[in-house]
Swiss-Prot record:
HAMAP family: Ribosomal_uL4_A
Quaternary structure and partners: Part of the 50S ribosomal subunit.
Lineage: Archaea, Methanobacteriati, Methanobacteriota, Stenosarchaea group, Halobacteria
Keywords: Ribonucleoprotein, Ribosomal protein, RNA-binding, rRNA-binding
InterPro entries reported for this sequence: Ribosomal_uL4, Ribosomal_uL4_dom_sf, Ribosomal_uL4_euk/arch, Ribosomall_uL4-arc
Protein name: Large ribosomal subunit protein uL4
Annotated gene: rpl4
Basic and acidic residues bias (residue ranges): 92-105
Protein purpose: One of the primary rRNA binding proteins, this protein initially binds near the 5'-end of the 23S rRNA. It is important during the early stages of 50S assembly. It makes multiple contacts with different domains of the 23S rRNA in the assembled 50S subunit and ribosome. Forms part of the polypeptide exit tunnel.
Disulphide linkage map: none
Length: 248
């Protein structure tokens, strides 16, 4: 299976025999398991103070007063879960282990299957990405791409490759996040757009594009390739990066 290596003008520069990793069977179940585990392992432990609602000298009056046997302080119920200022019935525990494990072979299969999905136009299109009909996937560009330092230069390359519409889609579909997150520095939600995989340092010229991510071939994960457990992300590889991904 061959693919085209494009230069920065979008023209054909050479051809490349794709590594065997791009022929990995499609396994969305394994991909989902690996991505969910990665998300779970990033969670920060959280829990309630064990003594919350318990710092009170309240005691029950006992029988004979015609009132419930709940601990009271100045006539007001305390400590019990149904009382104002009482403890929580089953609060989250900070010591709870929220991590998830995935077998080594499963994790490797998930990564390889997610890589193979980036070469399937139907999977990429089903995920919502927009690109011209004559675009050949996977998209591979020459290593000169890693030397670009201006965002406008990257935009010009994407336009010549026929995939810039996906950046526009992500920018135009920006929405305000529901919930408290909007007041905590993450006001907007943007759809994921193009993933750039490079060989050396991540390209700073591409990282500011709407919805785009830039990672090295050594650090790319199944979650980068399948955000939200949905494989088939529109991906641009450099020539050196696609060879390094094959060795993962």
């Amino acid at each position: 299976m061959e693919t085209t290596i494009h230069n920065l003008n979008g023209d054909k520069a050479d051809t490349l025999e794709l590594p065997a990793v791009f022929e990995t069977p499609y396994r969305p179940d394994v991909i989902e398991r690996a991505v969910v585990a990665a998300q779970a392992n990033r969670k920060q432990p959280y829990g309630a103070d064990p003594y919350a609602g318990m710092r009170t000298p309240a005691e029950s009056f006992g029988s004979g007063r015609g009132m419930a046997h709940v601990p009271r302080e100045n006539g007001q119920a305390r400590r019990v879960p149904q009382a104002v200022s009482g403890r929580k019935a089953h609060p989250p525990k900070a010591e709870k282990d929220q991590s998830k494990s995935v077998n080594t072979k499963e994790r490797k299969l998930a990564f390889q299957s997610a890589v193979a999905a980036t070469a399937d136009p139907s999977q990429v299109e089903e995920r919502g990405h927009q690109f011209e009909n004559d675009v050949e996937l996977p998209l591979v560009v020459s290593d000169e791409f890693e030397e670009l330092i201006k965002t406008q230069e990257v935009v010009d390359v994407l336009e010549s490759l026929g995939v810039h519409a996906d950046i526009v889609r992500s920018d135009e579909n920006k929405s305000i996040r529901a919930g408290r997150g909007k007041t905590r520095g993450r006001k907007y939600r943007r759809p994921k757009s193009i993933l750039f995989i490079t060989s050396d340092e991540p390209s700073k010229a591409a990282r500011n594009l709407a919805g785009a991510d830039v990672v090295t071939a050594a650090n790319v994960s199944a979650e980068d390739l399948a955000p939200g457990t949905q494989p088939g992300r529109l991906t641009v590889y450099t020539e050196s990066a696609i060879k390094e991904v094959a060795d993962r």
